[in-house]
Structure formats: structure tokens, C-alpha cells
Amino acid sequence: MEQGTVKWFNAEKGFGFIERENGDDVFVHFSAIQSDGFKSLDEGQKVSFDVEQGARGAQAANVQKA
């Protein structure tokens, strides 16, 4: 799993971006967040995640709050 920091996340639209440790950004969709209840992330929050190749490129999967 990789570590990263939430760059921004729009809870209304259900997606955002995580900055990877190498400086690249990766797309994150709320459905990839591993938590109960309302699935959202906060700007600046530390997370761990896997990276999968989606239809539009790299995207985060199995996102867990650190």
C-alpha cells in the first residue's frame, strides 16, 4: 500500500485527489473509501491506499484513513 495526503475532496460530488509520496496526484472516488457510514475525506488527511488502473488512468482503491 502507498501513503499519501488528501489534496482535496468534494463530498457533494463524491470524489477528489490524493497526493502520492512521489508528488503525483491520484483520483479517488468515495466508493474506494474503506469506512462505515458517510464516506468522505478531509483536505490534508493522511491515508493509505492501493493504486489501480481505471478507464481514465490511475485511481486510488482500498483507501484507509491513517
Swiss-Prot record:
Gene Ontology BP term (one): regulation of gene expression
- Which InterPro entries does the entry link to? Cold_shock_CspA (IPR012156), Cold_shock_domain (IPR050181), CSD (IPR011129), CSD_CS (IPR019844), CSP_DNA-bd (IPR002059), NA-bd_OB-fold (IPR012340)
**Record's Pfam families?**
CSD
- Report the record's disulfide bonds: none
Q: Which SUPFAM superfamilies match?
A: Nucleic acid-binding proteins (SSF50249)
Compartmental location = Cytoplasm
Give me the Gene Ontology terms describing cellular component.
cytoplasm
Keywords assigned? Activator, Cytoplasm, DNA-binding, Stress response, Transcription, Transcription regulation
Q: Would the keyword Transcription regulation turn up in this protein's UniProt record?
A: yes
Q: What induces it?
A: In response to low temperature.
Q: What Gene3D superfamilies does the annotation carry?
A: 6.20.370.130, Nucleic acid-binding proteins
Primary location recorded for the protein, binned into one broad class:
cytoplasm
Domain of life from the UniProt record:
Bacteria
UniProt keyword Transmembrane helix, yes or no: no
List residues of the CSD domain.
Answer: 4-63
Q: Which GO terms describe its molecular function?
A: DNA binding; nucleic acid binding
Full protein name: Cold shock protein CspC
Which species? Bacillus subtilis (strain 168)
* Gene from which the chain derives: cspC
